[in-house]
Amino acid sequence: MPQLLRDILCVIETFHKYAREDAATLTCTELKQLIQSEFEDIFQPCAIHAVERNLNLLNIDSNGAISFDEFVLAIFSFLNVCYLDTQSLLNSEPRQVSKPEGMPHDMGLQVTNETDQWTEGTSQTQDKVVLPSGTASSTHLSLEERAVEHNRVDPQGHTTAHKLPVETSEHSDSKNQHLKGDEQSQKVDQDVSATGDSRTQRETSKPMAGSEQISSHTKGEGQNKEILQKGDILARKQSGTETGGRFGEQEGSLGILHSPLEETTQRPGGSSEDQEVAGEKGVKGHPKSQEPSVQGKDEPSSEHVDLPKQAAARKPSQTQKSAAAKDESRTAETPEPPIQEKEYETRDLSVQGENRNVSETPMVRVERKGVRGPEVHQTVGQKQIEEKTQPPALEEPTEDKKYHELQESSKEKNAGEDSETHELNSEGGEQKDSESEGAISPGEEARHAEEGTAEALVNSKNAPEAEGTPGTRERIWELTTLENQSGEKNKMTTKIHDKLVKEDDGYQGEGSEPVATQNDERSPETPNSLTAEDGDSNSETSDLFVQGDSQSQTNPFRGSVQGSDSNNPETQKHLALSEEKRVQEAAVLAVRGEDEQVTEEHAQEHEGQGSATTGRGPAVEPRGHSDTQVFIVRDENTKSLEPGIPGAPNAGITKQLSVRQLPTKKDSRKELKDQSPSTKKEEDGALEAQEDLVKSLDENNAVSQKTCPATLEEETESPQQLAGEQSLSTKEHDPSVSESGLEERMQRDQELCLVERGAEHSSPLYEALQEKMLQQTNVTQGEHQNQAQTASVASPEIRRNQSSASLTNDSSDGLVFFIDRQALQKYIREFLPDEDPTGAQQISAPQALEDKQGRPQREELEPQKEASAPKQ
């Protein structure tokens, strides 16, 4: 009440202030001055003119003066009309002004409405109020004015025509979200014009119309964005990226909501370009997860451009560098797969648009099914690698420096090898892809193997290649059971291999040819791309990546090649051939097992080593299965034989790889030769034992005879020829080593291979042969046992060191693996010093001799032998 009384007093004082002539009435001039001075922030100039024109409505008695009674009634009648109009505006849509007093028309501007309201309201009070002029007091007038101001402050009674649009817009925000920017722009203009300039409403009204157009333009722009995003979503769906599409829709809706706000807060007079920029800025204000979306669409940031460009450009650059070091003719072929990958990545960029980082992984996973995942698979793995290890430019110089010495020494021989390899590549069809991928960054395999394992687990869930994993696990489990069932091992072996053939055929029929091609394509890429550069460590690393379907996707670079080659009809043909060979090899090896004690000790040793290297790249394979365990320590020769190569795009590659890796193992065991020398007699006895063993295998192994009847005949011839070639090639690089020493090392390598296989597939026949051979070699058992114990104790520690060293230096891989194989070889030699040397040879050599492409691969092996010596 006290406030109300003060306001009334203010109205009275105001009236008397302007009633100067007689202090009781207001003339037309005085009333005009009062309205202009006191109500200028309420009324528009047009309203003041309307009051002046319609002054006769206020001057009811037509005496030319307005008394206080007339003034009070007229003002409150007018304020009542304004209040009702304000309430109707607040409760209805904008521009729909209620006319409780029967206004004649709506001009589209609140100003005109207020003028009409004034006119109507005053006309209705005309009959009721008769105001004699000069009867009002200035105190009454000031009270009236304060009442008007109070109404203006009242949140419900915003009677000002100037602020009406603001209240209206604020109220209608919840209903019309796209107009929110208009009201905000008006608020800004009105705050600026708070000084009370009566011309502000005109300026505000024009921006209102302009801002309406802006908001409609914003809506149209948002709809355009929706249309574009829907087009992107359709494109993504066609390529199998529904997940990325959902992200695009979410992002599109957010962008539409935010862009009107940001655009209209720019001044209403802004151009459409400014609005687009504002919309982009509004979307850029999203969380960081959404930020790359708009950047990918309109303003790609340096990070986004760098990642795909690095992913695409880095492949050709690395491939060209490594290929140029090896052969100029191969360089022309090598960049082709990266170009295809770059096209895929470019398409991914255009299709994904805003969703580059948001939905990168889901998109790639789904798209891999449609595109068969070659380049996309690599894109994911390589981007993850690049995010963790940037810049890639640092990786290439390190590798180039490391391999530079090896390249110079092997350049002359690579000239001849590469010419033959060129023919091999043309015959191999899409094997060029695997070469290029292998040449990309072999050193990265070891460094990124930790990430690779996690990626393999993720990728295997989405990629079709993972369908072959159950078969491999069943294989591992069944082969493990072979060790524990000594009585029925031969029978189970035959059944298992028959089953494996069916399984592999089934998986291939289900469209998971990449499973069969996966390991195989990695095998050829290792000899082709790493010949002169990587030496032993990287060849071992690559071969270890080949092993096991559980790790078949560990290396994202390798996995990218699988899908493309698996569609090749030649690849499918070679799959069948390689399956038959694998059945034959497994059957032959099944009869050559070692006693179960050695098997258990090997398993324990490998498990101990595996526990220390769980973070290790090549040795990341699960250690629970003996089959996988043997892969880790088994030499590349054995790796290229069975599950490492379920099917090859080029059968010759498989054979070549097995032959090619033998001298690598020989060089890695130069130290072993000094520790455990054997005599010519042992070698001769070993050869005789091998011939006997081959004969017994021919009699007892029906599977191998049915699968490949001519294999064993070639096996008897191949060891001597292979030994001669390898001894010559090794002589060139290491003249100090005698030919007999080379043969000895070769036999030891092969012995190691078959002893490990024998550990899985021991049989009564082989045990009988083993006892016979053990009697001949009792002389050297004590010496070998001591050395084996020393090395086996040291090997877990070496493995542990290897897990940390592999991330920083690739050369440590070769050294550690060499020592581990030496330890295992010494450990095995206490049981079978010279028993099986030709076994591995007989399996690997016929594979190399059956195909014309074997010799180039064997010749390419020589640079690897050079690489092993410096790394040791």
Swiss-Prot record:
Q: Which residues form the EF-hand domain?
A: 46-81
Write down the superkingdom of origin: Eukaryota
Q: Where is the composition biased (Polar residues)?
A: 117-127, 538-570, 699-708, 718-729, 774-793, 801-812
Q: Where is this region: Disordered?
A: 117-759, 774-813, 830-872
> What is a single Pfam family found in this protein's UniProt entry?
S_100
Q: Which Gene Ontology molecular function entries are recorded, alphabetically? A: transition metal ion binding
The cross-references to Gene3D superfamilies, in alphabetical order and at most eight, read: EF-hand (1.10.238.10)
InterPro entries assigned to the protein according to its UniProt record, in alphabetical order: EF-hand-dom_pair, S-100_dom, S100_Ca-bd_sub, TCHHL1
- SUPFAM superfamilies associated with the record: EF-hand
What SMART domains does the annotation carry?
S_100 (SM01394)
Biased composition range(s): Basic and acidic residues: 142-155, 164-190, 218-235, 296-307, 324-348, 365-375, 399-435, 486-505, 571-584, 592-608, 664-684, 730-751, 849-865
UniProt signal peptide: none
Q: What's the protein name? A: Trichohyalin-like protein 1
